[in-house]
């Protein structure tokens, strides 16, 4: 969801903290957090926004498992004239940049999307070597990766990472069902 489609979507770090605390008080065991640029309302990977959210939730004393996303930074949309060139709608960054906030803030868990799939106007792109790198770094920081899978092929990819020793047992799966294009 976006703030344009749903005015209840929290945008600022303080709104995200408040929403997470409300969810925990209502019975949520886990809060999965993305951050947005408060000025543009667009998704952000700004570590300082994540720090404000993480510290706000932890400082509240609420008993909830913190789950930070690693998803942003894997969205590729080709230009019409040359599909090898990313359009302005793309948001690609290095695997290191995608997990920087996780390594620094060390939530209990973080999402690790084991997927490459089409979305409405872009491809969500996760190269196997990037997944291996991110999973090793995440676990070395003491964070449990939540393996997000959207179809049976993604389960096979996750199992391969487990068999090859890139994901420690027991794995923690999140089955994302009812998602368009996945």
Annotated model-derived regions:
Residues 1-18, 70-94, 120-124, 180-182:
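Active-site mouth loops of central-metabolism enzymes
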Residues 4, 29-53, 119, 176-179:
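Glycine-rich, proline-tolerant flexible connector loops at the mouths of alpha/beta enzymes
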Residues 13, 17, 28-40, 65-67:
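Histidine-centered catalytic micro-motifs
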Residues 16, 23, 34, 110, ...:
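Conserved, mostly hydrophobic/aromatic
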Residues 20-21, 47-55, 99, 131-135, ...:
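Generic structural signal for well-ordered alpha-helices
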Residues 24-25, 58-61, 99-108, 136, ...:
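Acidic (Asp/Glu)-rich catalytic clusters
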Residues 41-70, 133-140:
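Alpha-helix-loop-beta-strand connector modules within alpha/beta enzyme cores
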Residues 108-182:
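Catalytic alpha/beta core domains of metabolic enzymes, predominantly
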């Amino acid at each position: 969801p976006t703030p344009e489609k749903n005015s209840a979507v929290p945008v600022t770090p303080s709104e995200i903290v408040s929403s997470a605390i409300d969810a925990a008080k209502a019975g949520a065991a886990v809060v999965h957090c993305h951050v947005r640029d408060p000025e543009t309302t667009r998704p952000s990977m700004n570590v300082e926004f994540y720090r404000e959210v993480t510290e706000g939730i932890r400082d509240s004393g609420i008993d909830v498992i913190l789950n930070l996303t690693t998803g942003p930074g894997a969205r590729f949309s080709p230009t019409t004239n040359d599909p090898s060139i990313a359009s302005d709608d793309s948001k690609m960054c290095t695997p290191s940049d995608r997990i920087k906030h996780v390594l620094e803030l060390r939530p209990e868990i973080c999402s690790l999307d084991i997927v490459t799939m089409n979305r409405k106007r872009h491809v969500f792109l996760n190269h196997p070597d990037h997944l291996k790198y991110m999973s090793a770094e995440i676990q070395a920081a003491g964070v449990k990766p939540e393996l997000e899978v959207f179809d049976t092929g993604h389960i096979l990819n996750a199992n391969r990472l487990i068999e090859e020793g890139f994901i420690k047992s027991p794995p923690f799966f999140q089955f994302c069902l009812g998602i368009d294009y996945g």
